[in-house]
Design a protein with these regions (language model features):
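Bacterial N-terminal signal peptides
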Residues: 20-33
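Short secondary-structure boundary segments
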Residues: 47, 67, 107, 182, ...
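His/Asp/Glu-enriched short active-site or ligand-binding loop at hydrolase and phosphoryl-transfer sites
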Residues: 192-214, 234, 261-263
Length: 291
């Protein structure tokens, strides 16, 4: 499950962009380095997933900026909390203008923006896109410690683990399941979604196929595998699009009589945060449901 990207590029390019940023830094009085504080006073996130962790783990006064994506309720778990927070498209000049003590980025954040911020002396924490629950714990811990709230990160991890440890009694034989997302994308072995499926008591049939961690799965193959549970995206806002039309295919509607449909809103497991537990609950309920 690739981490969501904000589609950002750095403002300005080459030496000209660097000179403009340096001038802006001089004007703001940020070019001189200062001793690191125990907790950065102003933190700007330029990644959807670190937006959520910053808002959930940081003090409100620390949240100096997030991405514009976090203000959209369709794809953000913290849209309400993000309203009123300065939002950027991740351009380096926008970020510098918010006077950050720390910037949170991610694997899919514009490398040009990250490089330019570092060139002018802005500290950047580059979070990863975890593919395992251990990786999720590590990234929560990394961000929490970076913003000076390691204790809150540990509390978030403990609550996530508590919810992921709920007793589950899947029916036997274990239900065979497949994830089908827009454009036919699915989740195979080595993905975070695969680990959640298996933990919930489901057999991921994609593991029986030669499919990348995240790859495309033909609809006909889904039907031919004899699945018991089909996991699709929950309702998406906006008009119908070609990417989602396959989820309305007549063949899938016919499966309704013998296949349980589990709808998981994409934002629940797009990022590595506490809402993963909500996605897990949907999967576990499907695993326990009678035929």
């Amino acid at each position: 499950m690739p981490e969501a990207s904000s589609g950002m590029t750095a403002g300005g390019d080459g030496h000209g962009g660097f000179r403009r940023l340096r001038g802006l830094l001089l004007a703001l009085g940020l070019i001189a380095s200062a001793p690191a504080a125990a907790a950065p006073a102003r933190v700007v996130s330029i990644n959807l997933c670190t937006d959520e962790l910053l808002i959930r783990l940081g003090d409100p006064s620390q949240v100096a900026g997030v991405t514009w994506l976090s203000t959209l309720s369709a794809g953000s778990n913290v849209a309400e909390e993000a309203r009123g927070v300065p939002a950027t498209h991740g351009f380096a000049e926008q970020v510098i203008g918010l006077r950050p003590d720390l910037v949170l980025a991610g694997r899919y954040t514009s490398r040009q923006s990250v490089a330019m911020l570092r060139r002018v002396g802005v500290p950047v924490v580059d979070a990863d896109a975890p593919r395992t629950l251990d990786g999720v714990r590590a990234e929560i811990r990394r961000v929490a410690e970076a913003i000076g709230h390691g204790d809150r990160g540990e509390a978030m991890i403990a609550e996530l683990d508590r919810r992921l440890s709920r007793p589950i009694t899947p029916r036997e034989p274990r239900p065979r399941a497949a994830v089908l997302r827009p454009n036919g994308f699915s989740a195979g072995p080595g993905s975070l979604i695969d680990e959640l499926l298996r933990r919930a008591g489901l057999v991921n049939v994609v593991a029986e196929l030669e499919l990348d961690t995240y790859g495309q799965l033909p609809l006909e193959l889904v039907i031919a595998k004899g699945i018991d549970v089909l996991i699709v995206d929950g309702e998406r806002a906006g008009p119908p699009a070609m990417a989602t039309e396959m989820l309305r295919h007549p063949a899938l509607r016919k499966l309704g009589d013998r296949v349980r449909i589990a709808a998981v809103p994409p934002k629940l497991w797009t990022c590595y945060g506490p809402r993963l537990a909500d996605a897990f609950d949907i999967l576990a309920d499907a695993a326990e449901a009678p035929r």
